[in-house]
Amino acid sequence: VGKYRERNEWFGRGGEPLIRMGVDLGLRMMGEQFVSGANIRLALANSREREAQGFCYSYDMLGEAALTAPDAQRYLAAYETAIHAIGKAAARRGIYEGPGISLKLSALHPRYSRAQIERVLAELYPRLLGLVQLARDYDIGINIDAEESERLEMSLELLERLCFEPTLAGWNGIGFVIQAYQKRCPALVDYLVDLGRRSRHRLMIRL
């Protein structure tokens, strides 16, 4: 029994490095399915092969919500850089054939909450509009990303303002991300259909 136990322990210790390597490889392979690169330039480079096969990408920047005004400014600058990079890579393919970008509104303002609605609308909307206009200049799609459920109404207010913005009239690159598992998803879809009709925009919807 003692020798059998020792042999099993030896095999167990000997197999640990292989198990670790296997787990590490598996995690890396899974990660590459969702994270294309550590920055936008790497992500664009790593996506070229799939794009040539007909895949379309909407790029998100991973990160948390802004906690301070300097955080929000850094995220704003990062989004501007990303839109320039994606726009150049898109090479005027248009909002349906080329890549796009998703924006996390809570990254653009440190107080993105209903309690601060007046301040948020006054301070965040000009930043959001500037990014959307930049995307329009490159003709790449730009989606407002999903946030926590209590922020949905505020996101919709900002979306509606964009849809009726005169400088964006006739452009169909505005999009919105829906959390399909929420109970109010059907009502939200109806609202977005109605908004598209009222504003004469074909909205880009992503689940």
Question: Each predicted region: which residue ranges?
Answer:
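Positively charged, amphipathic and often flexible ligand-engagement surfaces
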Residues: 1-207
